[in-house]
Amino acid sequence: MKPKLLTFDIFGTVVDWRRGLSEALARAGRPLEAGEFDAIVDRQGALEQERPFRNYREITKLSLMEVLDFDTAWADAIGEGAGEWPVYPDAPAALKRIMAVAPCVAMTNSDRAHGVQAQRALGFMLSAWICAEDVHRYKPDPAFWGEVARRLGVEPGPGWWHVSAYADYDLDVARSLGLTTVYVDRPHARSGPADHRVADLEGLAALVGR
């Protein structure tokens, strides 16, 4: 079945999350060491499920302060500019090809400001951009998915494809809801069961264009 809608994880799937964070830390004089990226991701995941809701800028700041004992001002600046991190080179052209087949919607654990930054880096707007700041939930909370379905006026099912490099944040829940899942094998991805597996978004463009 061809997709009627594609939703995308952004950080780690479209945006090169690790490279962006590594470069930001290097500019602050604190190179990222082995194992620290995963530790930061895991701490962010825990903070995202706490209440009251915090925006992603604050989540990033707290995770850097707690995991790396990082300076508060630098950590806040890194969180503010996360949407300016580089996109994967294959992303812009591939997403344009995919958007010719079906709407492409960001479904991202980030802030609205990061969406403005990231779409500027892509060079165009996606069909819609729905972020944690909009719904006051973070993936993998199923309530995020329910709110996305409500906003888009769609029912979960195989015509809705969800695309991510992360099983734990995205694909496991998407599968449980009956969506078609696509795993993108990015560096530092977290693999898991998926209906389709591609090396990059060019591979996805080829898949949906068949």
Where does each model-flagged region fall?
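N-terminal helical cap/lid subdomain that shapes the substrate entry/recognition surface
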Residues: K2-P89, A93
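Asp-based, Mg2+/Mn2+-dependent phosphohydrolase catalytic module
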Residues: M1-L6, R18, T72, P92, ...
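Short glycine/Trp-rich loop-beta-loop segment that forms part of the substrate-binding cleft
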Residues: M99
